């Protein structure tokens, strides 16, 4: 009986923690393909694939504006941070995602173990060359420190750095939408379904960055599931 109760408690804790760190679910309008699908079977013809050069060409002659970036699996490959957090705070479980001690570790130093994604380097360099304003909006729980802001500023050589916006997450609302709208962001780059919907709800374009196939954040999203444009070779 005690074993059964412990098992039920563990399952409920995992469900609760996952629910606390996920967006609402919006049904897709297209088939969509995960990064794993696209790596093994090639680029599907029914997904709108674009490159950084394509975006740069589209924006020629347009005045500078604000663009936004998600952090985890979009700007940084941060699986090492989350894997370490799970091992330390809730081995084989997900309750660490509701533990402020984990977020303080992640936000106040462990991000140094995150790897910058090449696609983020290319996008940020292109937008800065245009004079666009760069914002980082994450679904993470915030901490009383400025490490992630400084790390991103140094890693991507941000000229006019804004503090990272910690929007948190919710199962009942898209928490990033108001920040995208309030900062008049026109393009928001993200790997999650919620990033695409948040951008659209704010009147911006959400462009999909492919989540790496070996990310600890599973299941891997279906790229193109909302008919959004997807960046080529953006899984790394």
Curated annotation (Swiss-Prot):
Q: From the Swiss-Prot or TrEMBL record, state where the protein is found.
A: Periplasm
- Region forming the signal peptide: 1-22
Task: Give the Enzyme Commission number.
Answer: 3.1.3.2
Q: Which GO terms describe its molecular function?
A: acid phosphatase activity; metal ion binding
Record keywords: Hydrolase included?
A: yes
User: Keywords assigned by UniProt?
Assistant: Hydrolase, Magnesium, Metal-binding, Periplasm, Signal
What do the Gene Ontology cellular component annotations say? outer membrane-bounded periplasmic space
Question: What top-level branch of life does the organism fall under?
Answer: Bacteria
Q: What main location does UniProt list? A: periplasm
Cofactor binding, note field: Binds 1 Mg(2+) ion per subunit.
Enzyme's top EC category = hydrolase
Does the entry feature the keyword Metal-binding, yes or no? yes
Listed Pfam families: Acid_phosphat_B (PF03767)
The entry's function note states:
Dephosphorylates several organic phosphate monoesters. Also has a phosphotransferase activity catalyzing the transfer of low-energy phosphate groups from organic phosphate monoesters to free hydroxyl groups of various organic compounds.
Q: What is this protein called?
A: Class B acid phosphatase
Organism expressing this protein natively: Marinomonas sp. (strain MWYL1)
Q: What is the lineage of its organism?
A: Bacteria, Pseudomonadati, Pseudomonadota, Gammaproteobacteria, Oceanospirillales
